[in-house]
């Protein structure tokens, strides 16, 4: 009998969802940084064996939206509750369980099995962990609570074991040689955006969208033209930097990661353009692939 299902990873920003996703799938599918709101889309990573297919989904962190981009991010997270065969709700040792949290309340009413994963236990002590387990038991009594460390991979194998046990009998949803639902261009944009998140401060990384305008693949080389969109002329100047040095650093570091990702020589050209207030424009958000409804 073949097993298959959707295993969706949800939780607040910066609790380690993307790191967990990469550890479970065994591939670097989601970008992971120390900054909140790194993930903007719902990203699938597909784990295949002869008799099993697990479709993991990494989702944006749950937050109260302040503009339309964040509304779209919340939509991705909420939709992950509806189609989950197994839900992985990720919290960490810093987060305090909140009985007034609407999203947690929705998780509590789910029919699908919920594994509540308390992440980053390598940064805590036993006493604090016991307190958190008891508090979460009270809040989500039906959930199975598992302490983990996605960074050190502590208990990640056990999480995978439980997922396999809970997965329903089903034929595969995707071809067995497919490892994600996203095209190559998507990973180019994410790797460039990751560098911007790492190298720029304050609001700059959150005001950026990356679009691949050309992706031309040859036998040993890929030619890529990418546009970095910002909301203000002042932001454009900051992204480019003095004598173009800041943008050059982003492009150089992104190119190295892209060469590792694709296993080919990368010729990368980057440009910076202003798209005023794109984060609040329905039209622009849809053109960038965000879900608004």
Identify the meaning behind each predicted range:
Residues 16, 155, 246:
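Conserved glycine(s) of the Walker
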């Amino acid at each position: 009998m073949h097993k298959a299902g959707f295993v969706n990873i949800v939780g607040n920003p910066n609790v380690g969802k993307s790191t967990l996703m990469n550890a479970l799938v065994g591939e670097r599918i989601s970008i992971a940084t120390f900054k909140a709101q790194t993930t903007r889309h719902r990203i699938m990573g597909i784990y295949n064996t002869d008799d099993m297919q697990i479709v993991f989904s990494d989702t944006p962190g749950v937050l109260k939206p302040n503009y339309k981009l964040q509304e779209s991010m919340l939509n991705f997270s909420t939709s992950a509750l509806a189609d989950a065969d197994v839900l992985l709700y990720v919290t960490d040792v810093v987060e305090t369980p909140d009985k007034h949290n609407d999203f947690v309340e929705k998780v509590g009413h789910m029919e699908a099995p919920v594994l509540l994963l308390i992440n980053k236990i390598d940064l805590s002590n036993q006493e604090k962990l016991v307190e958190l387990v008891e508090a979460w038991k009270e809040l989500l009594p039906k959930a199975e609570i598992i302490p983990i460390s996605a960074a050190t991979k502590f208990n990640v194998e056990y999480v995978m074991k439980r997922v396999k046990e809970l997965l329903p009998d089903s034929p595969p949803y995707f071809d067995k040689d497919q490892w994600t639902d996203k095209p190559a261009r998507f990973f180019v944009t994410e790797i460039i955006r990751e560098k911007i998140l790492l190298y720029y401060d304050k609001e700059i990384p959150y005001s950026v969208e990356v679009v691949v305008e050309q992706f031309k693949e040859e036998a040993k080389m890929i030619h890529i033209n990418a546009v970095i969109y910002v909301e203000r002329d002042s932001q454009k100047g900051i992204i480019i930097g003095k004598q173009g040095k800041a943008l050059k650093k982003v492009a150089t570091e992104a190119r190295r990661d892209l060469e590792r990702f694709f296993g080919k020589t990368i010729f990368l050209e980057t440009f910076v353009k202003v798209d005023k207030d794109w984060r609040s424009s329905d039209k622009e958000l849809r053109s960038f692939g965000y879900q608004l409804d």
